UniProtKB/Swiss-Prot annotation:
<dbReference type="InterPro" id="IPR005337">
    <property type="entry name" value="RapZ-like"/>
</dbReference>
<comment type="function">
    <text>Displays ATPase and GTPase activities.</text>
</comment>
<dbReference type="Pfam" id="PF03668">
    <property type="entry name" value="RapZ-like_N"/>
</dbReference>
<keyword id="KW-0547">Nucleotide-binding</keyword>
<keyword id="KW-0067">ATP-binding</keyword>
<dbReference type="InterPro" id="IPR053931">
    <property type="entry name" value="RapZ_C"/>
</dbReference>
<dbReference type="InterPro" id="IPR027417">
    <property type="entry name" value="P-loop_NTPase"/>
</dbReference>
<feature type="binding site">
    <location>
        <begin position="60"/>
        <end position="63"/>
    </location>
    <ligand>
        <name>GTP</name>
    </ligand>
</feature>
<dbReference type="Pfam" id="PF22740">
    <property type="entry name" value="PapZ_C"/>
</dbReference>
<dbReference type="GO" id="GO:0005525">
    <property type="term" value="F:GTP binding"/>
</dbReference>
<dbReference type="GO" id="GO:0005524">
    <property type="term" value="F:ATP binding"/>
</dbReference>
<feature type="binding site">
    <location>
        <begin position="8"/>
        <end position="15"/>
    </location>
    <ligand>
        <name>ATP</name>
    </ligand>
</feature>
<comment type="similarity">
    <text>Belongs to the RapZ-like family.</text>
</comment>
<protein>
    <recommendedName>
        <fullName>Nucleotide-binding protein Pmen_0867</fullName>
    </recommendedName>
</protein>
<keyword id="KW-0342">GTP-binding</keyword>
<dbReference type="InterPro" id="IPR053930">
    <property type="entry name" value="RapZ-like_N"/>
</dbReference>
Amino acid sequence: MRLIIVSGRSGSGKSTALDVLEDNGFYCIDNLPAGLLPDLAERALLNTEMLLPQVAVSIDARNLQSHLRRFPELLEQVRQRNIRCDILYLDADDETLLKRFSETRRRHPLTDENRSLAEAIADETQVLAPIVDLADLKIDTTHLNLYQLRDSLKLRLLNQPEPGTAFLFESFGFKRGMPVDADLVFDARCLPNPYWKPELRDFSGLQQPVIDYLAAQPEVEEMYQDILAYLEKWLPRFAASNRAYVTIAIGCTGGHHRSVYLANRLSQALKKPLKNVQVRHRDLS
């Protein structure tokens, strides 16, 4: 049995996550009281009429805070039943969450006559601390639209042909902010920039003209070899520590050329030794 627990601050995309999982064969339960987690696991395993190989539940700030404080204990009870359990935590920056609530005009679960929306959003971080501290996978949805979020969820949660640690190589542009869910970040902005070559500007780091240009630059090759040597040594240690997900982010200014080239090349080089390797280009439209 596989169980995915979806959590995160209100407005971060939990409903979308459940929709994606339901569309891919998961039995989904929204707003499950955390105290019922062990009972749900037991019933799903033992009741032949309720044999559910894939279950997803959302647990968030709508829960009793006393149940949320017990979350580590409840999770341990589930994992003692030899259930594969992943915790997905979605979040976005405060400004983005405020904007989303303003657009939908929905009520935040923590607002009341003494607590404004901005205060509720800030307080929710503390309320969910017992869950976020145990999250296997964190996704920052600040810069993701609905379709990008759905694609990201499919890539990280559903596209895992091999058991063990899933390694995501993600390119990004610093001008849109660093991915807060990255475990390792490498900065490629010091490398020669194809953007300043008019004949290369409209190509991406996945296309041959840019690939040929960057492959011919000694600094690019030197950085690639240095990063590759580091990752070859240390990523197996991440896997040995039973990490479910590791994100390696490579950034350049716009996220179109240098970071894309390096992320793609590194993912190809490490695909065989690491087995479960994925690649995503955050800012490549």
